Amino acid sequence: MKLKLLAFLLFISGNLFSQEINKENLDDYLNYIEANNGGIGSLSIFKDDHEVYNRSFGQEKLPNITFNQDTKYQIASVTKMITAILILQLVEDGKIKLDTKLSDFYPEIPNSQKITIKNLLEHTSGLGNFAVRNGAIWVMDKVTEKDIFDEIKKQGVTFEPNEKVVYSNSAYIILRMILEKKYKKEYHKIVEQKIIKPLSLRDFASVKSNPENTFKSYKFTESWNEIKDIEYSNVVGVGDIASTTKDLNIIITSLFQNKIIKKETLDLMKPILGKEDWGRGLALFEYGENLFFGHSGDVIGCHSRLIYNPKDKISISYSTNGERFPANIFVENLVNIIYSKEFKLPEIKTF
């Protein structure tokens, strides 16, 4: 039976953020998404360092699956925030410097004598996107580390360091490789040692830890159907981690409480307001006067957003394994609900 699109504006009384987040309005919004097959995912909201809202939506529309509150989502490039934190921990420990040249580790990479660790972190290195070759994604099936490294060298650079900001997956693969050189262990072991154990995370894992109970990717064509996504072992340190939304909020809250890195290091991670959109592992997300810092992640079927507002100590973690309208619209509406502002429900085609 076709569901009619609810074409109306949702008005919420009040204009200022209150200490109590309106869970009923959040439920109404997610009920609308769910009823219209708008997405499949999970939402967690933290306020003052603890969870005040958690809900999954849409999963019951999936055929022949089992899931629970511990089922993980692929968080795609939110993984890069973790990699940046790990690199900056090395900086704090004096084991590497932001101005260390890439040539100290991989002199065979083009322009490595000019590219610094800082350039790699902030997407100003000039390196490209190893995952796309000849205009197509070629990491759908498992490839070797050598294949990836050869592609990075072949693509080279498209501009000189610091000339501009261009998002670079290749830069973060290299940062992961540098981490493994410095620690003399694989990325998933570093994540376990430096992130998972200190924060007592239950449902957070890099792909080589073989995480179980993880959602597959889906696409909607009259119904939700499983689709093939990238091979996550090809993007370790770039987009391979799986997590619950709750564990993601624990991480970003702990980050802004200076439990993972020092305050001055966190300030370095953040983009400079008025000058940058991208920092060194954190990006700026503006929703009117409300400023959040965090990271986004998108692959073929999975999408994730993790953002934190330092002023109000609010964090929003949102992951999907199937969606039919842009995540930025979804999250903007969530922010409007939290701050008691007017917004328009997204139009979702019915079949």
Regions found by a protein language model. Name each.
Residues 1-21:
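Bacterial Sec-dependent N-terminal signal peptides
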Residues 18-34, 220, 340-351:
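Sec-dependent signal peptide cleavage junction
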Residues 288, 323-351:
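Short, gly/Ser/Thr-rich active-site loops of penicillin-recognizing serine hydrolases
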Residues 97-112, 197-199:
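Short, glycine/proline-biased beta-turn/loop segments that scaffold the active-site neighborhood
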Residues 113-300, 304:
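Short, surface-exposed loop or secondary-structure junction motifs
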Residues 30, 43, 49, 71-99, ...:
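Active-site SXXK
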Residues 21-73, 95-100:
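Short, conserved catalytic-motif segment at the N-terminal edge
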